[in-house]
């Protein structure tokens, strides 16, 4: 599997994500600097990592979404290439228009860094096929702006089209309807605030994030 991990000024989870992809998928991903304007045509995955791109100035992900590399990401996503945005990556994908809604300041106005309970809502996305519907998992979060917000019509549409990927099992940050991750209409773009790459082996406290990458491998096989 050929994967690319984007790197922006302020990214700090890009190496963790690259290690997870290499460990599970067996190939070392390309590390793509944000100033690149092209991506290889034969990619099987584009991963947008967590961190604080551009220091979260203006809004989280707002400046990164306007980086030189993003038109190529949008083009590949429209072709059906799987795109995974984690934490700041999720924020970037919403700012770029690849996913609906926005990530606002946490309801408690504080940075949240802990493991949280999640419930799998969708099992048809290439990232989620090895999970079971309504399966309970735990993944770590580490964010200040993870409060998912959208208007009621958009939220209803996400529910009706089975595009809510994961839901918190409790109110973590004030997210509308406890949404932790959403999909685009095709199902090939996933954005989520929790960090699956930080929980892929028992030494990390569990392997609940492993199947998010293994699912994609199964689809590509």
Curated annotation (Swiss-Prot):
EC nos: 6.3.5.3, 3.5.1.2
Pathway: Purine metabolism; IMP biosynthesis via de novo pathway; 5-amino-1-(5-phospho-D-ribosyl)imidazole from N(2)-formyl-N(1)-(5-phospho-D-ribosyl)glycinamide: step 1/2
GO biological process, one term: 'de novo' IMP biosynthetic process
Active site (UniProt): 87, 195, 197
Cited PROSITE patterns: GATASE_TYPE_1
Domain Glutamine amidotransferase type-1: 3-221
Entry's Gene Ontology cellular component terms: cytoplasm
PANTHER family given in the database record: PHOSPHORIBOSYLFORMYLGLYCINAMIDINE SYNTHASE SUBUNIT PURQ
Role: Part of the phosphoribosylformylglycinamidine synthase complex involved in the purines biosynthetic pathway. Catalyzes the ATP-dependent conversion of formylglycinamide ribonucleotide (FGAR) and glutamine to yield formylglycinamidine ribonucleotide (FGAM) and glutamate. The FGAM synthase complex is composed of three subunits. PurQ produces an ammonia molecule by converting glutamine to glutamate. PurL transfers the ammonia molecule to FGAR to form FGAM in an ATP-dependent manner.
Protein name as catalogued: Phosphoribosylformylglycinamidine synthase subunit PurQ
Source organism of the structure: Zymomonas mobilis subsp. mobilis (strain ATCC 31821 / ZM4 / CP4)
